[in-house]
Amino acid sequence: MLAVLLLLLSACSRTTAPKPTMAQYFAPSKRIPVETTAEPTQPETTVPDRNDAARSAFQRALRTVHDDLRWPELPDSGNIEVWEPGTIEDEQFAVTDVDGDGEEELLVSVSNTYMVGMCEIIYGYDPQTDGVRIESHSYVGVTHYPGMLKVEASHNQGYAGDVLWPYAIAYYDEAEDSYKDAFYVDAWCKDITDYDSYTETPYPDDIDTGHDGYVYLITENGERRFMNRADYEKWEAGIFTNKEPLTVPWQKITTANIDALVK
């Protein structure tokens, strides 16, 4: 199961990313763009052969969500609470091969609720139990890529300011059939503070060689490193080049849509 980086930032009791090293206090912002040469179209998720055993398991899981307002395989998570006048039927699910392993997965997203209840879960089929197992458990701000997830933080209350919204990267591990934490990305604007009292670290002027007034923080395996803008843009291009977001076929969690999975 995906250990959701510290990205969980209290959301959905996740553990999808390494824990941020700075307390977060400021509002959202735009991300520094990387130059692109074309406006590519979004790839579709793959269409594997239909597995009715898997679909039946997904159908049962969705009925647990719809009828019991509970997350399958998360017995201690409590009830799903949806803010009125909305209902669970306003929330979303999809059945598609999102991880590229040739088998369908079940994605369930609940967002019309309190912050810590907002989450997206990717379930895979477990033929040993004829049930479902969790491949990824994260906050709702997920962009799906082939073999990769980009998960936005639930809050931007650190020192990133208007440089970027913090996010985590997780990669699909075929051997484990689940997503694994890789990176947590944040930023530090010198105008907000030139000293991080939490880590007792002064602003790294030696890293900010372009005198941009901000640096990026990449956390990997619990270790944090600083990057200036030029180095970050190269690093970011290495992560996202030739990867386009997948189009996920979301639909509402209605009785009719659940029943239509297997007839």
Task: Describe the function of each predicted region.
Residues V47-T87, T129-G141:
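Blade-edge motifs of beta-propeller repeat domains
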Residues N112-M115, G158-A160:
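Short glycine/acidic-enriched loop and turn motifs that connect beta-strands
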